C-alpha cells in the first residue's frame, strides 16, 4: 500500500474513532519549528513547509515508518501516528533537521 493511501485510510479510520488532536510543525530555515512533540495514539502532525526550499520528511522507526517525499515550499502534509512509540523524524534533503515525536496514552 502506498504511503499516501495509508495516510488517507488512516485519517478516515481515525476520524470516526473520537476526537484526535492535530499538531502543526513548520519547516523554516532548514529546521523544524519544534524539536520534540508528545501526542496520543491516533493524533496527527501536519508538516508545513514555509521554507524557500523543498524538504523530504520521513521516519524509519520500526512500526511507525512514513515518508512524505518531496514537499515543495508552501505545501502541507498530515501524518497519523496510530500507536505508541518514540519516532525520530528527519529530512533526507537536510540531514541536520531532526525532531522526536513521543506517542503515548
Language-model features and meaning:
Residues 1-3:
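N-terminal secretory signal peptides that target proteins for export/translocation
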Residues 5, 11, 16-105:
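Extracytoplasmic copper-binding redox domains, predominantly the cupredoxin/blue-copper superfamily
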